[in-house]
Amino acid sequence: IGFLDDYLKLRAKRIAQEKGVEYKKSDSDGLAGRFKIFGQIVLGIIVGATLYFNDSVVVKREVVRADETAALPVFDREGKSIKYDSVTIDGKKRYYVSAKNVITTIPFVKSHEFNYAKLLPKSLESFTYILYIIIVIFIVTAVSNGANITDGLDGLATGVSAVIGIGLGIFAYVSGNIRLADYLNIMYIPNLGELSIFIAAFVGACIGFLWYNAYPAQVFMGDTGSLMLGGIIAALAFLIRKELLIPIFCGVFLVEVLSVTLQVSYFKYTKRKYGAGKRIFLMSPLHHHYQKKGYH
């Protein structure tokens, strides 16, 4: 999506140069906003459907056995017996089963867990996948657009994404280690430690790019890079089951989006009421407000 948008903009610039006329940047040169949103929705559907329907995307749930010699009465949706793993932690044997569910991490509550199925009546819990995919679409679209809006100053989106990646990488590593997950009382997700390798590469790529993208920037990522950064961060958050922590992780993205929303809404409201639009910030997104004040 971002690549096609950037390509169309560069193509319009090249055509203007070939005609010998001054190029004036315009939003109409790239993809229309509705096409960008459509592409992000399609991406959200793919990510959500993969996470929900792929049998390898599971979490480990601890089960208690009163009798070590008795068979463990755990069954899946089809009534088949589920295998369990036994792990010795601090000299005590613990038993875990792989569970396919839509449980995620929710901050600042005692259990640290939340099941999306609880948002629906019991009679409609079989349609949880629809609700889950809608949530994925919303978050993927919001985060990718947030990263895109943040990419307005040299090194801003790249630096913020690197910091977010470090936080997600730590969560991925501890969530994939059964002993650390048990000690920290967080959700254990098997094989998630391998994801930390990808996240390390992601952070390294951001830092490497930042070397050339820091002020004064020599290289720009455009929509190709910023939309990709947001999409990767959103997908990683869902894989780690930490998507409800995104307002904390992606606080800068959130503030940037809110600044644009407030600016546009307030301008339209005051123009309709007083005949002349007023602004909250000197310019939005927020980083341009501080740039106008000379803080850059």
Give the residues covered by each predicted segment.
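A broad, structure-centric signal for solvent-exposed, well-ordered loop/edge residues
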Residues: Q17, I45, E113-N115
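N-terminal TM1-TM2 helical hairpin plus the immediately adjacent luminal interfacial "cap"
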Residues: A99-A117
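Juxtamembrane helix-capping/reentrant segments at transmembrane boundaries
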Residues: Q17-F35
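Alpha-helical transmembrane segments
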Residues: I1-F3, Y7, A12-I15, R34-T104, ...
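Short aromatic-rich membrane-water interface segments that cap or initiate transmembrane helices
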Residues: S28-L31, S111-T128, I186-S196
